[in-house]
Amino acid sequence: MSPREIEVSEPREVGITELVLRDAHQSLMATRMAMEDMVGACADIDAAGYWSVECWGGATYDSCIRFLNEDPWERLRTFRKLMPNSRLQMLLRGQNLLGYRHYNDEVVDRFVDKSAENGMDVFRVFDAMNDPRNMAHAMAAVKKAGKHAQGTICYTISPVHTVEGYVKLAGQLLDMGADSIALKDMAALLKPQPAYDIIKAIKDTYGQKTQINLHCHSTTGVTEVSLMKAIEAGVDVVDTAISSMSLGPGHNPTESVAEMLEGTGYTTNLDYDRLHKIRDHFKAIRPKYKKFESKTLVDTSIFKSQIPGGMLSNMESQLRAQGAEDKMDEVMAEVPRVRKAAGFPPLVTPSSQIVGTQAVFNVMMGEYKRMTGEFADIMLGYYGASPADRDPKVVKLAEEQSGKKPITQRPADLLPPEWEKQSKEAATLKGFNGTDEDVLTYALFPQVAPVFFEHRAEGPHSVALTDAQLKAEAEGDEKSLAVAGPVTYNVNVGGTVREVTVQQA
């Protein structure tokens, strides 16, 4: 064969899910980004060539009504209008929806239907316990609505979590009708070799056409290599965030991943000019949110502690409130013991907060002398099945302290109908607009929704710094810099003027 006859295969396209409109600002600035700071980038995001755009779900719904006085449903409708060519994607906590407890199946159905009706395309459905029973109904509702159901595996490390176990869970999700599988690494624990092994094993077991999406955070500094190894193993789509909203406890930069693949036999086919415009847009608005910025850069200690950053800050605030910050090391050591007693659940919302709070209680009050209601529920099965057996001694204590009995069935099977009750209660609230969307807002956040409904007409309340405030801060910094060096004074001492130079400390 002559050189001219050598076949050159086309690079394999790797899809990209852009996270800047949801998880990027949730991870970097406590989910405080206002809609007004996102709309200007939507046209470029829509035309950049992403596989999907994550823009809703997770903590954004709560943040909209609690902090920003924004209607989350209006946010979704606006994204749909501004990005007509994009697959819009959300993160859904299975039977928990976007709240912090399990909801009756009818509420789940209504929520999924309304999300689809308002413009959502891809539903990434996960469960904090990796219990497929807690994902089944939500996924069925997504399929019924004619949308993309993405079954999710929460990645964690423990003596009971293995490649084989993750492959088995992937099979269960596929049997439920999952259109794709997401491997979700929320704490940046996924090292390169396990990334390769898990992706390859799922592909080898269920076929190369099985779509797998990979979500990694960047907190530990190793996961960009993990993305590369996953791509080599056949992963179809990876999650990234535009560079001006990336790294730290956030995610790997979109442009870096795209550039990394050039010349490797893989490509993203993204429009670099559009990426640079998106980058510049968020680079300009990010300083407005600096008071909410996470201070975390790279932290490899997570590999040992298994404690994600959000969980760490939550425990610190609890200890600070009790004047016991000196107990932090003891609490850090207690977390793995509490997690083991609970059967090694992945540390993701809400299990991370529940395990962390119980660790604080154990250190402050003695081991399981006082158990939170939520931790007792985990021990008794009310959050679902744990990956491993729970400590029977702690289960017994949970029974005694809570007055409840252990369960083995799907927790939502025990819930009474609640839609009619929620509808009637919501209808009595000032500012309620009569829609199912408002009923859902009340059902998910019954303490916050009444205040939001009453003040919704006032419009969004951005918590970002204004341009005037940023300018004033910059001018203040310049004045500080002006006196940062040695300062010379003329001092009159007994009628004699002396020149004194003072060096700034």
UniProtKB/Swiss-Prot annotation:
UniProt-listed InterPro entries: Aldolase_TIM (IPR013785), Carboxylase_cons_dom (IPR003379), PCB-like (IPR055268), PYR_CT (IPR000891)
Residues annotated as binding substrate: 22-26, 59, 184
A GO cellular-component term linked to this record: cytoplasm
GO biological process: gluconeogenesis
Binding site for Co(2+): 23, 184, 215, 217
GO function terms (MF aspect): metal ion binding; methylmalonyl-CoA carboxytransferase activity; pyruvate carboxylase activity
Cofactors (names): Co(2+)
Cofactor remark: Binds 1 Co(2+) ion per subunit.
PTM comment text: Lys-184 is carboxylated in the free enzyme and helps to coordinate the cobalt ion. Lys-184 is partially carboxylated in the complex with pyruvate, but is not carboxylated in the oxaloacetate-bound form.
Keyword terms: Cobalt, Metal-binding, Transferase
Domain Pyruvate carboxyltransferase: 14-276
Positions carrying N6-carboxylysine: 184
UniProt-listed Enzyme Commission number(s): 2.1.3.1
Catalytic reaction(s) noted: (S)-methylmalonyl-CoA + pyruvate = propanoyl-CoA + oxaloacetate
Any matching Pfam family: PYC_OADA
Outcome recorded upon mutating residue 59 to T: Decreases activity by 96%
Highest taxon, organism lineage: Bacteria
Function: The 5S subunit specifically catalyzes the transfer of the carboxyl group from biotin of the 1.3S subunit to pyruvate to form oxaloacetate and 1.3S biotin.
PANTHER family, per database record: PYRUVATE CARBOXYLASE, PYRUVATE CARBOXYLASE, MITOCHONDRIAL
Subunit: Homodimer. Transcarboxylase is composed of three subunits: 1.3S, 5S, and 12S. The core of the enzyme is composed of six 12S subunits. On each side of the core there are three pairs of 5S subunits. Each 5S dimer is attached to the core by two 1.3S subunits. Thus the total number of chains is 30 (6 + 12 + 12).
Protein name listed in UniProt: Methylmalonyl-CoA carboxyltransferase 5S subunit
